[in-house]
From Swiss-Prot:
Signal peptide: none
Annotated crosslink Isoglutamyl lysine isopeptide (Lys-Gln) (interchain with Q-Cter in protein Pup) location: K375
GN (gene name): aceE
Organism: Mycolicibacterium smegmatis (strain ATCC 700084 / mc(2)155) (Mycobacterium smegmatis)
Record keywords: Isopeptide bond, Magnesium, Oxidoreductase, Pyruvate, Thiamine pyrophosphate, Ubl conjugation
Keyword Magnesium: yes
UniProt name for this protein: Pyruvate dehydrogenase E1 component
Reactions catalysed, as given in the entry: N(6)-[(R)-lipoyl]-L-lysyl-[protein] + pyruvate + H(+) = N(6)-[(R)-S(8)-acetyldihydrolipoyl]-L-lysyl-[protein] + CO2
Function per UniProt: Component of the pyruvate dehydrogenase (PDH) complex, that catalyzes the overall conversion of pyruvate to acetyl-CoA and CO(2). AceE has reductase activity with pyruvate but does not react with 2-oxoglutarate.
Annotated coiled-coil segments of the chain: none
Self-association state and partner proteins as the record states: Homodimer. Part of the PDH complex, consisting of multiple copies of AceE (E1), DlaT (E2) and Lpd (E3).
Length: 929
């Protein structure tokens, strides 16, 4: 949008006596700051323009200015581009390409698809089921999809590798209906819509969910906003694979079908500049502008197409508007003075919606009748002819022209803004109505009218027999329309959507790769973040999987000690490095390259999560298994982008997610918004996330080795690993002899038994950075209180919980069968004394295993907000330091009747555990963020 600045100083010093009060307006982009090398010529041009304006009026002046801008662009004159154009089609009629298909045939089976989609949702509302669905979205977008399916979307058997199509979630009924005509789905399956487990014939998920329909859906697009973001990063990753020589993706296109209401989601628009910056001409957004969201108009007082045009064009996208169908061409051609275009420009979306909820007479009076010139344009047209003036998104030729132009455009991503009617063809109770999104069934008269519009050969008797169960329609596999439909898909490389479920396994490195991590750090203090980075550094050297590892970093590489990777792996940039880096002379210079391996996303966790998803699903989308390692401040992972990680799980992404600088007390000084004491809990809610909270480097080595085997071995699992790692350095021990690796991976093993027997016994369970405090607590218990404490390392509270829950579920369903014993129960079965759990997480994390811990169980944690202070002070405040653990153990012994409660009270007073100022500096407190 143009910004105007009034320069009063210039007005006051005007040199024109006849216009002393004239105010000079300076617009952005106008060359007021450039030297005028020929003032006389400039004055002549301006005078000519003034004369034109006076003689021919603003419309003619505007036309000539636009033509000049057009010619300047053709001649490659660098001038600011317009961000908004008239409310008409971008592609003029005379430049529309020939439509290559048989439009009559395609329209016939498009009508059948419309019918079956609506009937599927309608039948899902039958008595006793009532699971609903959305009818109107696909009704508005059927043409947008069908032009793509018939002429553009390439399947996986295509020589170029196939396209990636993100389908709008609410349009899923239409995709199922097409698959039914293709012979991929049965009527029984259609009747199982939204009844995935209860329907005997097999059910269909509500929306595109690959995890629920793994050989069909490829990309999840709900919740809304995730589709556009993930499509951008899928397109960028396709270039990444090509530029690094891993796969030729030059003939693969990414299509994202979106809704205009969806574009209000921050994720929908917030990353479109990435696509422009990366010149992703392999990406096309198709936005179905039916002008309505769930409750009402998207922009009742405005114009969403114009808004989106300005937004995308300003961000550097190629914009194609498909506003009006072919029936408008004659009227626009006859609009010699621009009255019709002016009417189109000035009518708000709320009125356009209302027009289509009425009839032709209403449109004549309330649209064309607002200007005598436009009223005269349609004077010879009947009300029905006016009513039949289609919107562009329902016109095969207009949509085809836009898609072809998008495919041919180079150097920019393209967005197609297609105007449609929500509930199109469904009748007066649906079309353009505010409630249409929530309407899930049709009345008998609506069914009959819909049948007539779609010309489906279904009789009144069939509809009246049971209005809840009107029949689906399929003409049979030998019908010419079905043969045509299938031939088009064969020519384009197979069915879409379709998902590859198997991929080649990787040759994984042996255990020797992890040797260094298992030796310990000696006297050197090393944080688990550094140990993790070192592990992957070793893996990057492996000739088989090294090139397939993709580090994903949201602008924190230096914090995590990964800046040494910049010069060796390099940062991926399609344009290479066109500047001289300020540190180019240094060994650890910031190096960008078109063949770089690192995806450095800037301060952008949302985009990083989308990159993780694209990389982590490459085994399916490209048959090229890639290994993402996405590392971030743990507070800004599941808390900030949990929805994206949930979608990654739905898409069955594999890889490593690393929550660095984890814990509530470890990140000294950073404070409330950075101190993470709950991401493990959030991660535990994601069924695909395998969570670990390792304390030692050798644990990390085993966990990563296990993760690679589970995700990339001979029988890969559709999971991803979430490791919480810390920035607090402490001495890393060597791997103990006879380490029970199986127990470590299950989530619990005995790390250090009490060195000698004492009067009383206890068990301390610790994870992550709490381990040094637990070990110190065991020493204090032995020296000060004559208590022998075994120290256990809990590598995964979450995995212990899941095992326990699974066993309980089996026990519930099969009470007469042995259900097994949870690992935590069997491990602690013979352990003496109370069990005290401590971590740098809120207590709800260790509380996950309470049902299966035998005996007295006490949990300590960091509940509440974090704050800025030293580590000892924070741990004393939350009572997770060694002294607090000692008191908790003594309280547990008192609860069991082993000692008097006064002993615990004595310890609490002695250690002053309620006094933050009394917190000592432990040997673990050697470093800062």
């Amino acid at each position: 949008m143009t910004t105007e600045f009034v320069r009063q100083d210039l007005a006051q010093n005007s040199s024109t006596a006849a216009e002393p009060d004239r105010v000079r307006v300076i617009r952005e982009g106008v060359a007021s700051y450039l030297p005028d090398i020929d003032t006389e010529e400039t004055a002549e041009w301006l005078e000519s323009f003034d004369e034109l304006l006076e003689r021919s009026g603003p419309a003619r002046a505007r036309y000539l200015m636009l033509r000049l801008l057009e010619r300047a662009g053709e001649q490659r004159v660098a001038i600011p581009a317009l961000t908004s154009t008239d409310y008409v089609n971008t592609i003029p009629t005379e430049l529309e390409p020939w439509f290559p298909g048989d439009e009559d045939v395609e329209r016939r089976y498009r009508a059948w698809i419309r019918w079956n989609a609506a009937i599927m949702v309608h039948r899902a509302q039958r008595p006793g089921v009532g699971v609903g669905g959305h009818i109107s979205t696909y009704a508005s977008s059927a043409t947008l999809y069908e032009v793509g399916f018939n002429h553009f979307f390439r399947g996986k058997s295509h020589p170029g590798g196939g396209d990636h199509v993100f389908i709008q979630g609410h349009a899923s009924p239409g995709i199922y209906a097409r698959a039914f005509l293709e012979g991929r789905l049965t009527t029984d399956q259609l009747d199982g819509f939204r009844q995935e487990h209860s329907h005997s014939g097999g059910g269909l998920p509500s929306y595109p969910h690959p995890r629920l329909m793994p050989d069909f859906w490829e990309f999840p697009t709900v919740s809304m906003g995730l589709g556009p973001m993930n499509a951008i990063y899928q397109a960028r990753f396709n270039h990444y694979l090509h530029d690094r020589g891993i796969k030729d993706t030059s003939d693969q296109h990414v299509w994202a079908f979106l809704g205009d209401g969806e574009m209000d989601e921050p994720e929908s628009r917030g990353l479109i500049q990435v696509a422009a910056n990366e010149a992703l001409d392999n990406l096309t957004f198709v936005i179905n502008c039916n002008l309505q969201r769930l409750d009402g108009p998207v922009r009742g007082n405005g114009k969403i197409i114009q808004e989106l045009e300005s937004f995308f064009r300003g961000a550097g996208w190629n914009v194609i508007k498909v506003v009006w169908g072919r029936e408008w061409d004659v009227l626009l051609h006859a609009d010699r003075d621009g009255a019709l275009v002016n009417l189109m420009n000035s009518t708000p979306d709320g009125d356009y919606q209302t027009y289509k909820a009425n009839d032709g007479a209403y449109v004549r009076d309330h649209f064309f009748g607002r200007d005598p010139r436009t009223k005269a344009l349609v004077a010879d047209m009947s009300d029905q002819e006016i009513w039949n003036l289609k919107r562009g998104g329902h016109d095969y030729r207009k949509v085809y022209a836009a898609y072809r132009a998008a495919m041919e455009h180079k150097g920019q991503p393209t967005v197609i803004l297609a105007k449609t009617i929500k509930g199109y063809t469904l009748g007066q109770h649906f079309e353009g109505r505010n409630a249409t999104h929530q309407m899930k069934k049709l009345a008998l008269e609506d069914l009959k009218n819909f049948r007539d519009v779609t010309r489906v050969p279904v009789s009144d008797a069939q509809l009246e027999e049971d209005p809840y169960l009107p029949p689906y329609y399929h003409p049979g596999p030998e019908a010419p329309e079905i043969r045509y439909l299938l031939e088009r898909r064969r020519a384009l490389g197979g069915f879409v959507p379709s998902r590859r479920t198997k991929s080649k396994p990787l040759a994984l490195p042996g255990s020797d790769t992890y040797k260094a991590l298992k030796k310990g750090s000696g006297s050197q203090a090393v944080a688990t973040t550094m140990a993790t980075v070192r592990t992957f550094k070793e893996l990057l050297r492996d000739k088989n999987i090294g090139p397939r590892i993709v580090p994903i970093i949201p602008d924190e590489a230096r914090t995590f000690g990964m800046d040494s990777w910049f010069p060796s792996l390099k940062i991926y940039n399609r344009n290479g490095q066109l500047y001289t880096s300020v540190d180019s002379e240094l060994m650890l210079a910031y190096k960008e390259s078109e063949v770089g391996q690192i995806l450095h996303e800037g301060i952008n966790e949302a985009g990083s999560t989308s990159s993780f998803t694209a990389v982590g699903t490459s085994y399916s989308t490209h048959d090229e298994p890639m290994i993402p390692i996405y590392i971030f401040y743990s507070m800004f992972g599941f808390q900030r982008t949990g929805d994206g990680l949930w979608a990654a799980a739905d898409q069955m992404a594999r890889g490593f997610v690393l929550g660095a600088t984890a814990g509530r007390t470890t990140l000294t000084g950073e404070g409330l918004q950075h101190a993470d004491g709950h991401s493990l809990l959030l991660a535990s809610t994601n069924p695909a996330a395998v969570t670990y909270d390792p304390a030692f480097a050798y644990e990390i080595a085993h966990i990563i080795e296990s993760g690679l085997q589970r995700m990339y071995g001979e029988d890969p699992e559709n999971v991803f690993f979430y490791l919480t790692i810390y920035n607090e350095p402490y001495q890393q021990p060597a791997e103990p002899e006879n380490l029970d690796v199986e127990a470590l991976l299950k989530g619990l093993y005995l790390y250090r038994p009490a060195p000698e027997k004492r009067a009383k016994s206890a068990q301390i369970l610790a994870s992550g950075v709490a381990m040094p405090e637990a070990l110190r607590a065991a020493d204090l218990l032995a020296s000060d209180w004559d208590v022998a404490a075994d120290v256990w390392s809990v590598t995964s509270w979450g995995e212990l919980n899941r095992e326990g829950v699974a066993i309980e579920k089996h026990r519930l369903r099969h009470p007469d069968e042995p259900a097994g014993t949870p690992h935590v129960t069997s491990a602690l079965a013979d352990a003496a004394g109370p069990v005290i759990a401590v971590s740098d997480w809120m207590r709800a994390v260790p509380e996950q295993i309470r049902p299966w811990v035998p005996g007295t169980y006490v949990t300590l944690g960091t509940d509440g907000f974090g704050f800025s202070d030293t580590r000892p002070a924070a741990r004393r405040y939350f009572n997770t330091d060694a002294e607090s653990v000692v008191v908790a153990v003594l309280q547990g012994l008192a609860r069991d009747g082993e000692i008097d409660a006064s002993v615990a009270a004595q310890a609490a007073e002695q250690y002053r555990i309620d006094d933050v100022s009394a917190a000592g500096v432990s040997y673990a407190d050697t470093g800062s963020a």
